[in-house]
Amino acid sequence: MMELKEIFRPRHEEAAVKYCQELVRIKTVNPPGDELPAAEYTASQLERSGADVEMVPHTAARASLLARLRGSGRAPALLYNGHLDSVPPGDEPWSHDPLGGELADGRIWGRGSADMKGGLAAMMAAMQALAEANIPLAGDLILAATAGEETDSLGAISISSRPNLGPVQAVVIPEPSSNEIFIAEKGVLWLELATRGKTAHGSMPELGHNAIMMMVDFISALREMEFSHKEHPLLGGFSRSVNTLSGGVKTNVVPDFCTATIDMRTVPGQDHAAILRQVEEGITRLKGRRPEFQASVRVLKDRVPVETPPEDPAVQRFAQIVTEIVP
């Protein structure tokens, strides 16, 4: 068996740096994403390594890709996954051009260099190193570079549903983790609640039904709801937070409409459908106490919590590798 240092050579480390710099220079701030040029650049580099590359178009300006080094088929594939988009650079001034990809002080500076074009570049270089070493693979090595992770997971949803993806034994996602292995992730359940009332002049509020006050009642009820869960040893507990509130048109007009968004973070073992039912039951109870109470709830985002057992062979192997290579 070849040692890691015989496979991943200094030129591959240099390639990873170059790939990261070039990807940072391609603007993929999401929204709107516009990941197509980054996907095309990634595809061109992986094709040079001998990978079979398939572009996965979403819109005229957005795409993901699948690259594959073929194995013998004796084992399921190992899937590398990384996203092409990045969050906006914000309003604060940068010390370096956020789209410059400048190498300074031992770091690559730019939007997405950590989250997660650096991880994507490392996977590209690793794939190149394995291809050049001509190591027989028991299963395929697949790299999925996806669009839209920062918003709606457009690319990941599309790629995971493709029939040609094939069986996968493990997924590696090199989000910035300071070389720690993360084996669990909280789920996300975003809800939008809307209350509807009856407008009236502010001088005669008794003639209307105040939708904002209805929302206040619901938020108070939400704080008292107990959502069944077990504390997770790695992730902690379930959380809920009302993070936006919008309603009313003028100070002297009783509002007839109000919306709020709720960010819930779930832990393994929780059922999102059961949580939604509990919220809907809370609405029913409020309506029973106040016949004029009108509310509806809508799911904005639904991602279930995930975890891999610590004793899983892939986790154990990754832990061994990290121990060997991290100073």
Where are these regions (language model features)?
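A structural signal for isolated positions on well-ordered beta-strands in alpha/beta enzyme cores
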Residues: E54, L79, I142-A144, S296
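Fold-level recognition of mixed alpha/beta catalytic cores in primary-metabolism enzymes, strongest
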Residues: D105-I108, S113-A114, G118-E224, P233
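Short helix-capping segments at alpha-helix termini
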Residues: S49, A133-L137, N164-L165, R285-E292
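Intrinsic-disorder/low-complexity, polar/charged segments enriched in Ser/Thr/Lys/Arg/Asp/Glu/Gln
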Residues: S64, D140, F257-T261
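Metal-dependent amide/peptide-bond hydrolase catalytic core
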Residues: M1-L4, T28, E54, I183, ...
